[in-house]
Structure formats: structure tokens, C-alpha cells
Swiss-Prot record:
Protein name as annotated: Conotoxin Cl6.8
Major place of residence: secreted
Propeptide: 23-39
Disulfide-bonded cysteines: 43-58, 50-62, 57-66
Length: 67
């Protein structure tokens, strides 16, 4: 009975570790892909349209227009 309980706990811990690692790896992969596309991204001029995406303004603030 004790051996079964220990095995069940071990399986649960290993499963949790696998899920955590998988989620982190996917997150890192998406961040790296986004950075590679950002280096090729067009930067709006000051006063140009950016919507609510501050990354379009590159080095300035953004709220509908680049500041």
C-alpha cells in the first residue's frame, strides 16, 4: 500500500514537471520568434499610426499615434 502511494506521488510529480517544462519551452519559442520578426518590422514615424501596439513606434511611446 505504501509503495503504491509513493509511486502515485512520483508519477504526479514527474507529470507536473513535464507540463511546466513544456509550457516554458513553448513560451520561449514564441518570444524568440517574435523577436526575430520584430527586427524586420517597420517602425512608424513620429505622429504615425500605431494603434495600441507600442512596438510599432520602436523607440517612442504609442497611444494611437507615435509620440
Amino acid at each position: 500500500m505504501k509503495v503504491t502511494a509513493v509511486l502515485m506521488v512520483a508519477v504526479l510529480v514527474l507529470t507536473a514537471c513535464q507540463l511546466t517544462t513544456a509550457n516554458t519551452t513553448d513560451y520561449v519559442r514564441r518570444i524568440l520568434a517574435r523577436k526575430s520578426t520584430m527586427s524586420k518590422r517597420y517602425c512608424s514615424d513620429s505622429g504615425g499610426w500605431c494603434g495600441l501596439d507600442p512596438e510599432l513606434c520602436c523607440n517612442s511611446s504609442c497611444f494611437v499615434l507615435c509620440g
